[in-house]
Amino acid sequence: MASRITAGATDLVKLFDTDVLIEHLKGNPRATDLLLEASSAGQAACSVLTRFELLAGMRSNERSEIRLLLDSLTNLDASSEVATRAGEWARSYRRSHEGISSIDYLVAATAEVHGADLLTQNVRHFPMFFELEPALSED
């Protein structure tokens, strides 16, 4: 699958970005398949920032489903190393890629620091990963 930071790697943790988890919650079968595949291999993870985004944006009637999903994933912390790397990227890309949020920089740095494959649909938010492709595209 070419949607990985390190294309072709199969044994790395899969770091699910918020958009892919939302697609799973909306019933997108491709997102669900990716999540189930990673979960069955013990490789499904999200950043604590993705956890924050989902919890902050959920409706009351979604609470139990979202918490169940988040609790089933390994939550990768945003350490000082992650913050430093994210800051370096923000400084490098802030003029050429104005729409990238601080959270996206931190998610990207989380993937790099933890050696994880980033699975996202928003590849334009992650210019630091040159070979990154949309996670839900058909192979």
Regions found by a protein language model. Name each.
Residues 20-21, 50, 82, 107, ...:
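Alpha-helix capping/helix-boundary segments
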Residues 1-46, 55-68, 139:
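Short, well-structured N-terminal submotif of metal-dependent ribonuclease cores
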Residues 17-18, 54, 86, 111, ...:
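Generic structural signal for small/hydrophobic residues in well-ordered secondary structure
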Residues 2-10, 74-121:
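Active-site neighborhoods of divalent-metal-dependent phosphate/nucleic-acid chemistry enzymes
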Residues 16, 46-47, 78, 121:
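A conserved hydrophobic position in a structured secondary element of the catalytic/binding core
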Residues 73-74, 131-135:
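Active-site regions of enzymes building and remodeling cell-envelope glycoconjugates
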Residues 31-32, 51, 63-66, 83-86, ...:
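A general structural signal for well-ordered alpha-helical segments in protein cores
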Residues 59-60, 121-124:
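Short, polar loop motifs at secondary-structure junctions
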